[in-house]
Amino acid sequence: MTKYNEAYCDVLIVGAGPAGVMAAAHLLSYGTTARPHRVRIFDATKEVNGSDESTESLSTDVIADALNSGASGPEKDAASTTEDLPMLVTTLQVSDVLHDTGDDTKIAYRETATEQQVLLLADTTANTSSTMNPRSMCEAGCRFHQIYQGHCFPEYELDSERLRSVDGRAQVLEDEHETGQLRLERLGRPEELLELDEENSMSVVTNLKAAPYKFLMKDVDENFPGELSTSGGKTTSISADESAIDAALHAVWDADDLGAAWHLDEASGLRAVDWNAAQWFKSGQPWTPDAAKSLQEGRVFLAGDARHRHPPLTGIGKNTSIADCYNLTWKLLGVLLGVARADPARTYVAERVYIRMRAATDIAVDAEMESLAAKWITVQLTLSRSWISSAKEAERWDAVLRDSAMSASKPMWTTSDMRASFDAGLMGHGHAHDHVTPTIKEFASSSISRSISELASTSWWESRGWGNGGPFESLMEDARWTGAVESNCRYAAYDRDAPVLHEHVAWVTRFTSRARTAVLEAAVGQAHVVDCWDVGLVEPALDDLDSAGAGLHVAHHADQWPAQLDEAVWPRESLSDWRIVTDTSATGEGYQTSPREAPGDYADLNADNAKAHFNGQFAGHKAYGDAAAADGGGCHGRILVGPAVRGRHLHREIPLGEECQRAAQPLFKEV
């Protein structure tokens, strides 16, 4: 028995986060409330005074009553607006109360739709609190600052008033002549002072899980109503209401100070915004995964964030914590209910230890990130936790041990149930259209450090056999606290990536099969490449092509040239390296290229020429294609337009029919 303040309990839970509450609810759901204080849960206080005291923050009786009554919290749609999120609702309620009392108070409001929490101000004297949404909150307490092409960005009102958010953190805004300062304070301790000067007078400070950073942009003369929104967790989008342009400005870390708080290094990272030049600012987040060396000490078990720290992305920490507690609590229940022998929880350590991130990994990846940053290559890391059934855990444990043994000489980033993907931006070669967005899926014993090194080189690089992917959980952090399979949070396998990197042309594609729809998107400078099932799905792609005026790659099942392509905007500049390739076979082996060999033969490429080429090629191979289709192939009738690099013309073979067995292995081919 555990003694605490003269009261006895069977299980004492320290920490009332997702893991702690999940553990308490699971224990209580099996009738462990027969005696008082069987399960107790404590959490640290949230006061700003810095107290280290703990309180019994959540009554287990309340949890038990909710479980017994079948009560549940409100259903939340992961795709809903932020108005449906608890943090916003609470903020609005506090704002209403303050307004009703007549207090002249500004509320620090944090956007919680993504991990990037953007500080917005709500003026409770504006009598708008009852109908506030994220944008009106921004407008009520902020003034807009002019930026490029009419896109507007909110600038904080600078005053000396102390603001306090409902989560117990405080901010101080100070006036200082025509410049400003914004100081973040947590638990009464100032952490960082960020300058808003005249030269870079527009600044937004965000807080990403205790990692403050700022975005900067030069002043311009345009003025158009806009709004601040967030997408992708770390991207701040600045978009106008009536414009098709979605501008994005991302943070770039300083290579000399990788682990410090985020900031934009003007000397190397801040550039003029020129949409025509297609310059990209990619985002990245240096972070260090950590894990406890031991998961158990006597009758004390570590679970959740107490035993492993993950990046604040994709819900991986939450899902892993829930899995920890579920693994542990059902074994504790066996002891509490008298149906199990003593100490069944010893298997908890063996079954959950493979989640740990090794220290060697941190050092290797930090070194690689520093190297990439020095080469103007920034990396954005996202992680998702793959679903592994309990029957597979023991089977994969041997592989994990082998990985651990190899880690000293070949550092590993992922363990057997982790998948990592990188989005990298390539800059610094002086070519306006240099851009690459490779995604690398890591499985089992793949080495991240090797992959990054190859990406940083200027040699040809193609993905190796990373293994077959399985379904994995949603990347949304506000998904339900559950390890169960949910159809709206998952999509099936057939994930394979084959990026090719070159110092002048970066051609990267991502292939994903979702149900019966396969969409392939790629970028070469401003070129948009789309591969789809039928002509109907081509239309939205053509809209993008019309606005980009870039290259085209279309595949379809139809026997006729799609009429929509007649309206497409075809590339008319720098086409000396472009040619048309058609495939009318079912096996993907019937690629036919134009007999023209001289560079520049397709400088007059347009819809008419491409259509004539397609029809000519199709007529010559129709009999073969139909025969192959009758055998279940169904892949004939395809046209590809692609660039050539150093005389090697690239296109990609993507079987379109569900019957094609090679759908899980799309590859680049050279012709």
Curated annotation (Swiss-Prot):
Protein name as it appears in the record: Phenol 2-monooxygenase
Catalysed reactions, as listed in the record: phenol + NADPH + O2 + H(+) = catechol + NADP(+) + H2O
EC number: 1.14.13.7
Entry-linked InterPro entries: FAD-bd (IPR002938), FAD/NAD-bd_sf (IPR036188), RIFMO-like (IPR050641)
Obligatory cofactor(s): FAD
GO terms of biological process kind: phenol-containing compound catabolic process
Subcellular location: Cytoplasm
Residues annotated as binding FAD: 10-43, 295-305
Pfam families attached to this UniProt entry: FAD_binding_3 (PF01494)
UniProt function note: Hydroxylates phenol to catechol. Also acts on cresols.
